Amino acid sequence: SMHAIRLCHQKGIKVGMRFTMTQDNAHELPALLGLMEDEGVDKFYLSHLNYAGRGNINRKDDVILKTTRWAMDLLFDTCWDYTQRGLHKEFVTGNNDADGVYLLFWVRRHYPQLADHMRAKLAQWGGNSSGVNIANIDNLGNVHPDTFWWHYSLGNVKQRSFPDIWRDTTDPLMAGLKASPRSIKGRCGECNY
């Protein structure tokens, strides 16, 4: 993998590293972030374990809350350090929509004067992008609201154009995903964020 990263850099191609954290590899995160800096990698993507598809076999290996918070704090600290040193890198997390709220808590602890601005930015971002900014077209042409909704098809690009499928809010699921704000129920609906 490192050889490929170096070859891409030689050709001027922007490169990223992706890390899906489990109990077995969480301890490697600091070294990977160090490697990112040493090798001049442009983007780091921390993926929380998602139980869809292949991820389901690793369910028992998912990290505990304490480890997740440690990893997020390390990622935020690293990102802040890079910013302070003028290093322009991208840090992204995925598969846990609570990351934005945890970032807000981190900002409140470390830079309370920035908390209102951060909350406004997170509200502007809007949270989960399923059905809005993320789509999945599978190998058969079926369009899904995102990469984890394989069980739900909105249509097929062999029968209708993607824009027609994507803009069609007669489908109740798409109408709900495109609503702003979204009507969310259950535990997530009770959250203040």
Predicted feature descriptions by range:
Residues 117, 122, 148-193:
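Membrane-interface junctions of multi-pass transporters
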Residues 2-140, 150-159:
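Radical SAM enzyme [4Fe-4S]-AdoMet core and its adjacent flexible, acidic
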